[in-house]
Amino acid sequence: MYDDMVAFITPEAMEEAVFTDDKQTREANIRAIEEKLEERYAENEEWLAQIGEAVYAFQKKTVRKMILKDHKRPDGRDIKQIRPLHAEVDCLPRVHGSALFQRGQTQVMTVTTLGSLSEAQRLDGIDVTETTKRYMHHYNFPSYSVGETRPSRGPGRREIGHGALAERALVPVLPSEEEFPYAIRTVSEIMESNGSTSQGSICASSLSLMAAGVPVKAPVAGISVGLVTGEGDDDYIILTDIQGLEDFFGDMDFKVAGTHDGITAIQMDIKIHGLTPDIIREAISRTKEAREHILTNVMEPVISTPRDHVGEYAPKIMQMHVDPDKISEIIGKQGKTINAIIDETGVKIDINDEGRVDTVSYTHLTLPTT
């Protein structure tokens, strides 16, 4: 069937169908080809059942040939070119911090919420040394981001994995509990998807944290590079900022996040047996160039340093330390003393066994004296 299909739908026709920078247009073009084949093979049920698989294989072969032999990407970009970028902060007025980051037809909005340290996530796992998690990053990939209407059944393996990658990328730049006594939660909502949503969520989260007044050490950006290989070790093309089609039909998705000064997280998905040292070196170099471009030309012009205060609607926290032997006096008999302070001032007071006292106000712009 494949040979007959290629004779009917020429390689030139398939190349024309996939050569567009609009995902919906490309999908419509491929669907039109499938409809022509369905009409041609209407009397052959066996071949009708194979149309989807055959068109996918033909599309993959065409895209790989365009990239490897012609050095031409499906959306017309140069091998090293990044898709159009856009960033903004304070998209949502009522939240503690928000930001939007867009790369081509991939768009991510991240919302930051701040809370007291007592609201950190409690962990019940094998590692007994880690019982709480102060920074939480959640990644949501709703069906509407790819133009579908399937029901949401909670986070899957993909959402959990992408959220964990973005979380690891940002943890190295977060302030300590002493510097910033807050629990921090970021939620990345994928508004539109055409590849590299995990890296987009890293960029959006970095912007959102700075907009929320979290004193991060440096902004973090993420980028993915792809790979298409030929017959020999030297026959390959590395693609900067891969879109969905290049991810599906390529051999690698190499994700790198970091600051101007270094890398904070790496993840590689690979479909071939291995990589040469030259490929690895070039891939890391490409991500460095792209990261510098994103940070310098897109993110930093929007917000270059964290705001010097948390937002109007974020809780205000004052931290102090007392002698652990005095904790019982602060609490009082059956909590009488501490509850009286809470009732009088309207604040929340958290005391741990080491004598750290966090006074949290959700209603006052400044903390009352207690």
Residue ranges and their predicted role:
Residues 1-11, 212-304:
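Mobile "lid/hinge" segments at catalytic clefts and subdomain interfaces of large enzymes
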Residues 91, 96-182, 262-272, 276-281:
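Glycine-rich, flexible beta-strand/loop modules in the N-terminal catalytic cores of phosphate-handling
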Residues 363-369:
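Conserved small/polar residues in nucleotide/adenosyl-binding loops
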Residues 91, 116, 142-147, 167-180, ...:
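Conserved helix-loop functional segments at active or binding sites
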Residues 294-320, 365:
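Long, charged amphipathic helices and adjacent flexible linkers at domain junctions
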Residues 353-362:
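Short glycine/threonine-rich beta-strand-turn micro-motifs
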Residues 2-130, 315-329, 337, 343-345:
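Extended amphipathic alpha-helical scaffolds
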Residues 8-16, 186-188, 192, 264-271, ...:
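Short, hydrophobic beta-strand segments
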